[in-house]
């Protein structure tokens, strides 16, 4: 897909902070599946820049950007716990602007995350939380080999 429509996948750097915040604000308006609180959406760019620097220098955290025509259209993240006993487990998250749903971008980004995790060799399990009613995401994760470990009810 990336070659067909000119999408670039690359790791986020501190200079991307403002554009990431804009993209996440847009995604938050487009879907009720994104679980962000007000503080995360109003995060000062300088604070996110510091976090992005930490992620970029880390070997068990990743923020991958999907960029089309200079605009961030999706993010895929892996966040590992800082506690040593849990630092081998990566929590996966994917957000895509609604205009780009159904084009295979989620698959492309998840493949890249899985490849990165194998290459780094420090994460031995990738896991995620997804709402059952988010059928697109559930389908993607099952297609990519993720298994349901538990279901929580409201």
Regions found by a protein language model. Name each.
Residues 8-22:
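A short beta-loop-alpha structural element at the N-terminal edge
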Residues 14-15, 25-28, 40-99, 110-112, ...:
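Acetyl-CoA-dependent GNAT
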Residues 32-39:
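A short, aromatic/hydrophobic, helix- or strand-capping loop or linear motif
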Residues 103-108:
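A short glycine-leucine-enriched loop at secondary-structure breakpoints
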Residues 110, 117-129:
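Conserved GNAT acetyl-CoA-binding A-motif
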Residues 141, 146:
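Conserved active-site tyrosine of GNAT-family acetyltransferases
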Residues 152-153:
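Conserved small/polar residues in nucleotide/adenosyl-binding loops
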């Amino acid at each position: 897909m990336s070659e067909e429509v000119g999408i670039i996948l690359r790791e986020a750097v501190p200079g991307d902070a403002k554009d990431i915040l804009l993209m996440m604000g847009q995604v938050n308006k487009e879907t009720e599946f994104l679980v962000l609180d007000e503080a995360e959406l109003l995060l000062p760019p300088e604070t996110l820049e510091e976090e992005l620097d930490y992620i970029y220098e880390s070997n068990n955290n990743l923020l991958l950007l999907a960029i089309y025509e200079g605009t961030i259209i999706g993010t895929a993240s892996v966040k590992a716990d800082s506690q040593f006993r849990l630092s081998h487990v990566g929590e996966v998250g994917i957000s895509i602007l609604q205009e780009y749903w159904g084009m295979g971008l989620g698959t492309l980004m998840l493949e890249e995350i899985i490849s990165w995790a194998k290459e780094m060799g420090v994460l031995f399990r990738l896991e995620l939380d997804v709402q059952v009613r988010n059928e697109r995401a559930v389908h993607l994760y099952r297609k990519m080999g993720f298994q349901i470990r538990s279901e929580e009810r409201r």
